[in-house]
From Swiss-Prot:
Gene name linked to the record: truB
Identification of the protein by name: tRNA pseudouridine synthase B
UniProt xrefs under InterPro entries: PsdUridine_synth_cat_dom_sf, PsdUridine_synth_N, PUA-like_sf, PUA_sf, tRNA_psdUridine_synth_TruB, tRNA_sdUridine_synth_fam1_C
Domain of life: Bacteria
Function: Responsible for synthesis of pseudouridine from uracil-55 in the psi GC loop of transfer RNAs.
GO biological process: mRNA pseudouridine synthesis; tRNA pseudouridine synthesis
PANTHER family according to UniProt: PSEUDOURIDYLATE SYNTHASE TRUB1 (PTHR13767:SF2), TRNA-PSEUDOURIDINE SYNTHASE (PTHR13767)
EC id: 5.4.99.25
Catalytic reactions on record: uridine(55) in tRNA = pseudouridine(55) in tRNA
Amino acid sequence: MQGFINLDKPFGWTSHDCVARLRKMLRLKRVGHAGTLDPAATGVLPIAVGKATRLLQYLPSDKAYKATVRFGVQTTTDDLQGEIISSQPCGGLSLSEVKTSLSQFIGKIEQIPPIYSAIQVEGKRLYDLARKGETIEVPARTVEVFSIDVLDWREGDFPELDVAIACGSGTYIRAIARDLGAIFHTGGTLAALIRTHSSGFNLTDSLTLTDLETQLQAGTFEPTPADAALQYLPSVTLPSISAQKWCQGQRIELNLETVGKVRVYQAETNIFLGIGELQTGVLIPQMVFEPIS
């Protein structure tokens, strides 16, 4: 078996928990995931099975979330799973004020990751240092947020904001919640997070673990084809002789102006062969997925 599974990660599970469960369900060792999700988050977790694990590095990095920010609360983890540092009612906060501030988080921004995160500093993961009580300065990173759209606003002593966020890889939604609360000196924390899109996969097409188990028992499960999430890349087809040479590591001269990574197929069978790099009319093998003889 090889391909992808668009998994709807359940609440409370780590991404590694999901991989371990799928290894048992599928009776395969070669299982991996793209884009780690926090245990408290749910939604799209792309799972690669078999040889498709070699394609994880080529998946698109765009992601989308539905997030709930709670104002007036600050925690150690920047979500509701951590210890409360401060709690102060802020019923006077208005949606118009919040909307005005959202523009500060759109575009390429400098973001300090939460101290409870898998980021490594000096070879150590931040959450390991945090659990030991060690204090360390977390360096800011450049991330990109494409859009933030307001979905709902609930007034109260601890008002909540629902937003849809589209962003690039490495963006921490917990950090956005924290920093948004800091602007108003109220504190802010992430109350809920659903990933609605990741690496070419959408929540509407995802499977829960129960769905997957049901399909496996019925013998109806088929993984998503290995090249399905790579449709953002242009494609190149090679006749059988050229395809064979390319799969053996040879460069193929092509009269094409395209430059960059491409999907490569055998013309006669439309078999996905792998990922190539086009450079000035030459197709260079990057990753041979399906060698042919």
